[in-house]
Amino acid sequence: MTDICDANKFKHRFRGYFPVVIDVETAGFNANTDALLEIAVSLLKMNSDGVIVLDRTLHFNIEPFEGANLEPAALAFNGIDPTNPLRGAVDEKVAFLEIFKEVKKAQKAADCHRSIIVAHNAAFDLGFVNKAIERNGLKRSPFHPFASFDTATLAGLAIGHTVLAKACKMAGIDFDNKEAHSALYDTERTAELFCLIVNRWKALGGWPLAAVEDDSDSTSE
């Protein structure tokens, strides 16, 4: 069994997984064909009382990969001009190598064996992340390839709304609609929402469990 002190660590709270909050902005909905244009990654930290908070955020504007599709409707929606030199965009591979380095460093510091993506409507972000990793031939990704924490689902359960802006406002988190659809802004609001839900569950007595079974013999997936 895990005592309360040990339960207040990422490695026990999420079964050895280190939660990493991610948001992407893209030029469409198809991860196979449409460009990844922006990504932000928020790293979290947990204090000795088991309360999690936003630690820091990495942010990259991304150059569309060669041959990428750019849907005009998607660009109009997120307001991104991929040709604007002021974006300071970098190659996908450059961004992901830096993300891998920083995530692995934080994961190791938390004594976790793998990282797990947290995102709002996580299947979308995870799909684009996985495709970018595959497209660039990157190995040893810190991220679980298919498991994730979806804050849309969590917010629907805990707060009663699945839309990020409305869930944040209902939870008392400031949300500026004019800043929305920026990966940097949305990631940090998603991180705040995830932390609030996890911390509230703990405050209500949902964690730690009275008795936690040792699952060391179960699959790591």
From Swiss-Prot:
Enzyme Commission identifier(s): 3.1.13.-
Record text on subunit structure and interactions: Homodimer.
Protein name listed in UniProt: Ribonuclease T
Note on cofactor: Binds two Mg(2+) per subunit. The active form of the enzyme binds two Mg(2+) ions in its active site. The first Mg(2+) forms only one salt bridge with the protein.
Pfam families: RNase_T
Function: Trims short 3' overhangs of a variety of RNA species, leaving a one or two nucleotide 3' overhang. Responsible for the end-turnover of tRNA: specifically removes the terminal AMP residue from uncharged tRNA (tRNA-C-C-A). Also appears to be involved in tRNA biosynthesis.
GO MF, one annotated term: magnesium ion binding
Matching InterPro entries: Exonuclease_RNaseT/DNA_pol3 (IPR013520), RNase_T (IPR005987), RNaseH-like_sf (IPR012337), RNaseH_sf (IPR036397)
Organism of origin: Shewanella frigidimarina (strain NCIMB 400)
Annotated catalytic residues: H181 (proton donor/acceptor)
Reported cofactor(s): Mg(2+)
NCBIfam families xref list: RNaseT
Lineage top rank: taxon: Bacteria
Annotated site residue numbers, Important for substrate binding and specificity: F29, F77, F124, F146
Domain Exonuclease: 20-194
Residues the record lists as binding Mg(2+) 1: D23
